[in-house]
Amino acid sequence: MTIVSRRQFITGVSAMTASISAFDGPALSATAGNQFDLSKPLEGWDTISGQWTVQSVPGASRNGMALVQRATDNEYNVIVAPGGPYRDVRVSVRFRPISGREDASGGLVFRFSEGRYYLIRANALEDNFRLYYFDRGRRMLSTTSIKPPVLGQWHQLQITAQGDRIQGWLDEQVLIDERDARFASGRIGLWTKADSITAFDELTVVPIDN
């Protein structure tokens, strides 16, 4: 097991497959972006809190290896990817909640700057899908009731941030559609809470061409 504070990433061409026609919104055009290889030791990442390791995880897409957050005694665990800042962007990641008694969540951080950021997260122990902003404390912007993600299975999170419009998907279903102009741009990251041990795979960041 390798504890990582750095990581390699691959710059390439990627197209996300989540349907945009499922909601009322502008057509998006985005193809070129960063696809991060979370199966290798990290380079250029900033660990804000937590113990982020690359290890074997069943169902991981690259040689069975994925990025896992293993700390269990922090309020929140955050790691921020290299690249950016991004304003208008689509981000997708696979996550697998492995264990947790207090919390079993996985989240996408976006528009991260100087400790302030937006977060969209799902929790295998709760029947809700939520959008938060963090600015010297957590504040909720939007929530919707869902069937909780299954512990021990892979799920997909996706966000689109375009201007003040923020949309969030869980397993290719759009569940959040909110407007907030608090943070204009920033970096991308991953998040867990409390004693969540969670794996992450296939992180893709695609700037939106307006």
Regions of interest found by a model, annotated:
Residues 185-210:
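Ligand-recognition surfaces built from glycine- and aromatic
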Residues 171-189:
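Short, solvent-exposed beta-strand-to-loop segments that form ligand-recognition rims
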Residues 30-49:
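Extracellular carbohydrate-recognition regions
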Residues 93, 153-161, 166-168:
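Short tryptophan-centered beta-strand motifs in secreted/extracellular beta-sheet-rich domains
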Residues 136-156:
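Short, aromatic/His-centered strand-loop micro-motif at the edge of beta-sheets
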Residues 57-77:
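Short carbohydrate-recognition loop motifs
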Residues 1-17:
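N-terminal secretory signal peptides and thylakoid transit peptides that target proteins
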Residues 71-130:
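Secretory/extracellular carbohydrate-interaction modules
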